[in-house]
């Protein structure tokens, strides 16, 4: 007799393999069998979000727009946030929004600071990824190990940093009665 294998379908509102892999890693630990696929969607915010509102809105838009033929959809957006007492005045944070067709839950990664020349270029209108590609000599660094890996000497890569925000966004879903979720 054939056994039936149940799995959860999850869409990630991005074609970035790091975001898909991080989502699959975290949700696989929580749910077991998951099928995670990247779905290209528009974030509805500038390519380089600056500030809490833009970054969170980008993550939420990605999650909502990726919700089709799935149980959960995930939106992940990185952005620069003003933080006092930092060298540059900004910290990079990744926000994750998870949508089930009714509720959005949010989580954020550990933040880190880019070098001053990177922040200056971004504030002048360039994307972090382009500046970091030039700085490191690695093409599409953000789709690979990420700037955080370069800056931390390999102690944390972008997949690990992205896993943090996905896990934090899952906390209410892992404790639904504490958060008033079904």
UniProtKB/Swiss-Prot annotation:
Query: Subunit structure of this entry?
Result: Homodimer.
Cofactor dependency: Mg(2+); Mn(2+)
Where Mg(2+) binds, per the record, is at 42, 69
* Co-factor note (free text): Binds 1 divalent metal cation per subunit; can use either Mg(2+) or Mn(2+).
Q: Keyword set for this entry?
A: Hydrolase, Magnesium, Manganese, Metal-binding, Nucleotide metabolism, Nucleotide-binding
Q: Which GO terms describe its biological process?
A: nucleotide metabolic process; thiamine metabolic process
Instruction: Specify the species.
Output: Methanothermobacter thermautotrophicus (strain ATCC 29096 / DSM 1053 / JCM 10044 / NBRC 100330 / Delta H) (Methanobacterium thermoautotrophicum)
**Which terms does the record give in the GO molecular function aspect?**
ITPase activity; metal ion binding; nucleotide binding; ribonucleoside triphosphate phosphatase activity
Query: What NCBIfam families does the entry give?
Result: inosine/xanthosine triphosphatase, PRK03941.1
Q: What family is this protein classified in? A: Belongs to the YjjX NTPase family.
Catalyses which reaction(s): XTP + H2O = XDP + phosphate + H(+); ITP + H2O = IDP + phosphate + H(+)
Specify the taxonomic lineage: Archaea, Methanobacteriati, Methanobacteriota, Methanomada group, Methanobacteria
Stated EC number for the protein is 3.6.1.73
Q: Which PANTHER family match?
A: NON-CANONICAL PURINE NTP PHOSPHATASE_PRRC1 DOMAIN-CONTAINING PROTEIN (PTHR34699:SF2), PTHR34699
Describe the task this protein carries out.
Answer: Phosphatase that hydrolyzes non-canonical purine nucleotides such as XTP and ITP to their respective diphosphate derivatives. Probably excludes non-canonical purines from DNA/RNA precursor pool, thus preventing their incorporation into DNA/RNA and avoiding chromosomal lesions.
- Full protein name: Probable inosine/xanthosine triphosphatase
For whether the record's keyword set contains Hydrolase, the answer is yes
Asked whether the keyword Magnesium is assigned, the reply is yes
Q: Name one Pfam family in it.
A: NTPase_I-T
* HAMAP family, sorted: Non_canon_purine_NTPase_YjjX
């Amino acid at each position: 007799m054939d056994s039936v294998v149940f799995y959860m379908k999850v869409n990630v509102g991005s074609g970035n393999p790091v975001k898909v892999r991080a989502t699959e890693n975290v949700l696989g630990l929580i749910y077991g069998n998951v099928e995670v696929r990247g779905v290209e969607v528009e974030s509805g915010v500038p390519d380089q979000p600056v500030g809490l509102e833009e970054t969170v809105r980008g993550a939420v838009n990605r999650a909502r727009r990726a919700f089709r033929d799935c149980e959960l959809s995930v939106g992940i957006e990185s952005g620069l946030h003003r933080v006092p007492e930092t060298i540059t005045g900004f910290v990079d944070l990744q926000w994750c929004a998870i949508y089930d067709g009714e509720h959005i839950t949010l989580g954020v990664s550990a933040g880190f600071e880019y070098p001053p020349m990177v922040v200056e270029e971004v504030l002048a209108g360039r994307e972090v990824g382009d500046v970091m590609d030039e700085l490191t000599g690695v093409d599409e660094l953000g789709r690979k190990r990420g700037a955080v890996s370069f800056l931390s000497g390999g102690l944390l890569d972008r997949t690990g940093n992205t896993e943090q925000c996905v896990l934090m966004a899952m906390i209410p879903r892992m404790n639904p009665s504490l958060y008033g979720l079904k």
